[in-house]
């Protein structure tokens, strides 16, 4: 019994030391090309990362168009997003980002087996953001502390997508229309910068019509 307790204590100590180390060094999510066979075979998902590290930006950004030109040699035009979990260890992923002048957006889509679950439970980071919208983004090697607000008005999402409906439907073998993909957009607000405060006030005006 004593040996078991000792083994458990050693295991706990190793886990704690590992987490403390990763808290300092960070652990980024791996990048897999969405167009690759590897991504398709993995169920269109990859292993998440943990903490993101880098210089934190405290200055307000008034024009986000530059994010559309991000072209990382590995991650291409994607960025990393760190979300808060209920158990305290971050969950970070690779996502798409869109800048439209002074407005910033992130987007994500669900298809195949993910459509079997109600939003936001088909993706872990969606669930995390729904519970706590405070996130950290790594763009160009720097950390931006943000607040995400889901755009619930599908007409507004269609406008952001240049007129494309966020709900994609196709006719199946049974001759009936079936939903094959649903795309969601979030408005992104900076927080923890002197001009904007913590970002909570900026999130208030967003529309709340049904998704």
Question: Residues of each region from the PLM?
Answer:
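N-terminal Sec-pathway targeting helices
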Residues: 1-17
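Membrane-anchoring alpha-helices and their flanking helix-loop junctions
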Residues: 2-5, 25-26, 30, 206
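Membrane-interface motif at the C-terminal end of an N-terminal transmembrane signal
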Residues: 14-33
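Short, conserved active-site entrance elements at the starts or edges of catalytic domains
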Residues: 27-90
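Short, structured beta-strand-loop surface elements
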Residues: 38-50, 54-57, 111-205
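Extracellular/periplasmic catalytic domains that process cell-envelope and extracellular macromolecules
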Residues: 73, 89-91, 98-99, 130, ...
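Short beta-strand segments
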Residues: 76-118, 146
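Short, solvent-exposed mixed-charge patches
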Residues: 208-211
